[in-house]
């Protein structure tokens, strides 16, 4: 069936999706965007910075990636705009080599990240800052999305890396290696209360010319987030189709329950002023050398507001107002 509207999206997660970006997968797999009359084609990108560069180069119309690259590029003068959040936090765990016994031993360690400024690097910097460690003593190794980071861990080439929750479970439960989980989901949530997360991003030019397409994009991602939150079967269906890591059913249900309990699903599109002022303040504290970015400049909240006016606001921390 030919749909009346189409959009090209870059995926900063590369060729795979995980729990931390499952809303994008669900919007495609569960037909949420199709129900809006929107045909979506995905282009893999090796990290959020690469995804945003594809948007700026005109190779795609919009992208999914971490909020850090968006703020970084916006500070540099690039006219990027956030259309909606696809999560409210980062569903990853910190996996380390066996010689790392505690967080103090992360000092002088090597970390595998997807890119400088990208999501795993942004969150890693938040962790290092919260632990009171000197970031200058961390050896950041740019290797790419989770599969590449896992490969470096298994090869013993790096000391630590943030890995998707499902991949971390499978990895640390595998007797074939001696990697361990130093900080799990709940511990990271306590350590870093304001966590960077994924967003859908476009350019000011595309926003100006294609408002109807972006309205459909926002409605679809909100609907997908709600279906993941409300329907465990839909979560499992999307997980099993897109996520390459096989886990026992009990572990998948535990991950879903964890996401629900932590209110990680962006069931109202999470563009609320308080959330974003805290995100921008956290980013500015990590990057004091960059020009300041305002919420009004970087966020196109009209599409989420329109979607919520039609779909209704759900109870939750991102209930609003969104603008």
Predicted features and spans:
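Short Gly/Pro-enriched turn/cap motifs at secondary-structure boundaries
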Residues: 14, 85, 190-191, 271-272
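Short, glycine-/small- and polar/acidic-enriched structural segments
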Residues: 2-136, 140-143, 155-165, 178-185
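Secondary-structure end/capping motifs
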Residues: 209-290
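Pocket-lining segment of extracytoplasmic ligand-binding domains
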Residues: 148, 158-244
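Conserved C-terminal helix/tail region of periplasmic/extracytoplasmic solute-binding proteins
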Residues: 280-323
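Predominant activation on well-ordered alpha-helical scaffold segments within soluble catalytic domains
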Residues: 25, 71-74, 125, 169, ...
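Residues at or immediately preceding the N-termini of alpha-helices
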Residues: 48, 103, 146-147, 232, ...
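Rossmann-fold dinucleotide-binding core
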Residues: 150-153
């Amino acid at each position: 069936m030919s749909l009346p509207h189409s959009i090209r999206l870059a995926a900063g997660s590369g060729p795979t999706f995980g729990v931390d970006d499952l809303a994008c997968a669900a919007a495609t797999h569960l037909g949420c965007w199709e129900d809006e009359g929107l045909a979506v084609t995905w282009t893999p990108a090796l990290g959020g910075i690469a995804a945003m560069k594809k948007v700026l180069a005109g190779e795609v119309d919009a992208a999914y990636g971490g909020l850090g690259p968006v703020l970084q590029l916006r500070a540099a003068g690039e006219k990027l705009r956030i259309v909606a959040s696809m999560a409210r936090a980062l569903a990853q765990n910190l996996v380390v080599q066996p010689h790392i016994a505690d967080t103090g031993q992360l000092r002088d360690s090597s970390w595998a990240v997807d890119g400088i400024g990208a999501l795993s690097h942004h969150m890693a910097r938040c962790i290092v800052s919260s632990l009171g460690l000197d970031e200058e003593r961390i050896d950041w190794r740019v290797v790419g999305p989770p599969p590449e980071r896992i490969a470096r861990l298994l090869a013993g080439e790096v000391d630590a890396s943030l890995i998707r929750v499902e991949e971390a479970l499978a990895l640390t439960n595998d007797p074939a290696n001696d990697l361990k989980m130093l900080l799990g989901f709940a511990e990271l949530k306590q350590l870093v209360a304001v966590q960077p997360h994924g967003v859908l991003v476009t350019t000011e030019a595309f926003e100006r010319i294609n408002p109807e397409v972006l309205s459909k994009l926002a409605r679809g991602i909100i609907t997908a987030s709600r279906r993941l939150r409300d329907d465990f079967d839909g979560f499992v269906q999307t997980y099993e189709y897109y996520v390459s890591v096989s886990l026992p059913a009990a572990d998948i249900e535990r991950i879903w329950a964890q996401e629900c309990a932590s209110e990680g699903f962006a069931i109202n599109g999470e563009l609320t002023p308080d959330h974003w002022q805290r995100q921008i303040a956290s980013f500015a504290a990590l990057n004091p050398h960059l020009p300041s970015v305002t919420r009004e400049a970087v966020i196109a909240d009209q599409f989420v507001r329109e979607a919520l006016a039609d779909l209704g606001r759900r109870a939750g921390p991102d209930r609003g107002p969104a603008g």
